[in-house]
Design a protein with these regions (language model features):
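Conserved alpha-helix/loop element of class I SAM-dependent methyltransferases that forms part
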Residues: 1-12
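Conserved class I S-adenosyl-L-methionine
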Residues: 12-19
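Conserved acidic residues
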Residues: 13, 56, 77
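Residues at the starts of beta-strands that form the adenosine-phosphate
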Residues: 14, 36, 165
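Class I SAM-dependent methyltransferase SAM/SAH-binding core
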Residues: 24, 28-67
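A short acidic, Gly/Pro-enriched loop at the edge of an enzyme's catalytic core
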Residues: 68-78
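A short beta-strand submotif of the Rossmann-like class I SAM-dependent methyltransferase core
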Residues: 81-82
């Protein structure tokens, strides 16, 4: 639904998935839209799996917090970055790189988890565990893969520093309010999430435009 909503709003030619992994999220994107699809990841094995899908080009980058993306300036129409920034020591470095490779007026679709909506805070209070939605059930605090915990405001601030303006908040796709979320109409989910993303969404999903 997130990709469909994005493509309903913008036109794309070159699409780049930063942190594409095995391609599970964007590997079939060319069935939805006519584009040139680039995948970038730090895991060589994952890239081997992604190579079985519809990517036109796959690129290996060792470290997203210090390595320049081997992509030309102002050459990409849309960058997708899902579940990556929360793993990085310096996520601003990557968002700056994404801004560099995007064309003027290009778009950035980004998603990060929100560990602490209302339900997450209650779980933390009861269990004293930062993994509020069991993303990594085998991890402990000393090796927990998520090292950055974002709010809507902190995401907007970081995007602003990288030269972006948020044009759509699609976090309502990740509305979470215990068992009741199944019975809440989409319009109400959207309203609650826009009013208070941090309280009602399990993930922060934003579409931003390069200024």
């Amino acid at each position: 639904p997130v990709l469909d909503s994005t493509f309903n709003q913008i036109k794309v030619g070159n699409v780049c998935d930063i942190g594409c992994g095995n391609g599970v999220f964007t590997g079939d994107i060319k069935r939805r839209v006519d584009c040139n699809l680039i995948g970038v990841d730090s895991n060589k094995y994952a890239l081997e799996q992604a190579d079985k899908l519809d990517f036109d080009e796959l690129i290996h980058v060792d470290d997203f917090t210090k390595d320049r993306l081997p992509i030309e300036d102002s050459s990409v129409d849309l960058v997708i970055c899902k579940d990556v920034l929360e793993h990085l020591i310096d996520p601003l470095f990557l968002t700056n790189e994404i801004s560099r490779i995007l064309k003027p007026g290009g778009h950035f679709l980004v998603h990060v988890p929100n560990h602490f909506p209302i339900i997450g805070r209650l779980k933390f209070l009861i269990r004293n565990d930062i993994d509020t939605f069991s993303y990594f059930s085998g991890a402990d605090r000393y090796d927990f893969p998520h090292i950055r915990f974002f709010t809507l405001h902190s995401m907007e601030k970081m995007l602003d520093l990288s030269g972006f303006s948020v044009i759509d908040n699609m976090s309502y796709f990740f509305f979470n309010f215990s068992i009741f979320h199944r019975f809440v109409p989409t319009k109400i989910k959207k309203l609650l999430t826009i009013m208070s993303t941090d309280n009602f969404s399990e993930g922060i999903t934003l579409l931003a435009k390069k200024l």
